[in-house]
């Protein structure tokens, strides 16, 4: 299977072009066609020779994704189900925010982190996405807006879809540098957020990369016992190790860390839990922020339900009284398969049922 040309960084593309007997400026032309003009075939690159276009076609695909399903919410949220060249399925979500268009990308096919409340882990990790497959998600969503002709552009990216980004570290890093490139999509680093479930050693590595993107940590519990019971990763990276890495990140980058905290009724949403969370984050309060997330129920995890508004409000009040910077996240796409991984999981279930029915006939 040929790789997507999106899998090449700009430096990779320059090296490949020179290696194949062309001048460096040809790489600049290709990059411009891909990310500024956003063409979907090499034939549209009209300032390249036919022989060079043939060489590109021989070695690369442009966009490796095929659109399977699109769900649009009443609030303007759009959820895409894309099929990869090997038939695997991934999700991408577009959210309309007051500050612009934000896209949430997937980094792995399935997830091995094992959070007990999450739809993403219903199907175990089958492989990493390469950086071209991650970039292609942005390009296909942007293509939709280009075709509408209203001049709308993706302004923000969150790496919070299916999978653990830091478990696919190198590909995610290449993706970040591609979409941030001033000569391409030029999405500002401070408009990009990467979320991790808590791979402490990778947080330290990320601190040393010099990228100015935002970091979010999926915390979801304020003590080791509770966090280990709902997030298996805490057994490998308990809170002491995780927070040591977070403190290192803040000291190294002087950048704020956001904590994601999903509100599970009767599990992690008591005033006592809120006080524990305030105490846990006290040392880094000036450069941390807590995002309280309403839970989107998942059929396969029916032991969990959404915290009622009064419990969320009480939790929020405790945090605010302790001086914690926090917000209750605005919901998106509640009338479609809203939970991360849910559309993919439901589609795969329907595909299996159809296959079984066909075999029975």
Curated annotation (Swiss-Prot):
Annotated ranges, domain Radical SAM core: 97-335
Disulfide-linked positions: 104-340
Positions annotated to bind S-adenosyl-L-methionine: 163-164, 195, 218-220, 296
Compartments in which it is found: Cytoplasm
Primary localisation category: cytoplasm
InterPro entries registered for this protein in UniProt: Aldolase_TIM (IPR013785), Methyltransferase_A (IPR040072), RlmN_N (IPR048641), RNA_MTrfase_RlmN (IPR027492), rRNA_lsu_MTrfase_RlmN/Cfr (IPR004383), rSAM (IPR007197)
Domain of life: Bacteria
Cofactor note: Binds 1 [4Fe-4S] cluster. The cluster is coordinated with 3 cysteines and an exchangeable S-adenosyl-L-methionine.
Entry GO terms, CC: cytoplasm
Recorded catalytic activity of this chain's protein: adenosine(2503) in 23S rRNA + 2 reduced [2Fe-2S]-[ferredoxin] + 2 S-adenosyl-L-methionine = 2-methyladenosine(2503) in 23S rRNA + 5'-deoxyadenosine + L-methionine + 2 oxidized [2Fe-2S]-[ferredoxin] + S-adenosyl-L-homocysteine; adenosine(37) in tRNA + 2 reduced [2Fe-2S]-[ferredoxin] + 2 S-adenosyl-L-methionine = 2-methyladenosine(37) in tRNA + 5'-deoxyadenosine + L-methionine + 2 oxidized [2Fe-2S]-[ferredoxin] + S-adenosyl-L-homocysteine
Originating gene: rlmN
PROSITE patterns assigned to the protein according to its UniProt record, in alphabetical order: RADICAL_SAM
Note: Reaction proceeds by a ping-pong mechanism involving intermediate methylation of a conserved cysteine residue.
Organism annotation: Streptococcus mutans serotype c (strain ATCC 700610 / UA159)
Name by which UniProt lists this protein: Probable dual-specificity RNA methyltransferase RlmN
Active site, per annotation: 91, 340
Record's keyword annotation contains 4Fe-4S: yes
Family: Belongs to the radical SAM superfamily. RlmN family.
Cofactor(s) named in the record: [4Fe-4S] cluster
Binding site for [4Fe-4S] cluster: 111, 115, 118
Keywords per UniProt: 4Fe-4S, Cytoplasm, Disulfide bond, Iron, Iron-sulfur, Metal-binding, Methyltransferase, rRNA processing, S-adenosyl-L-methionine, Transferase, tRNA processing
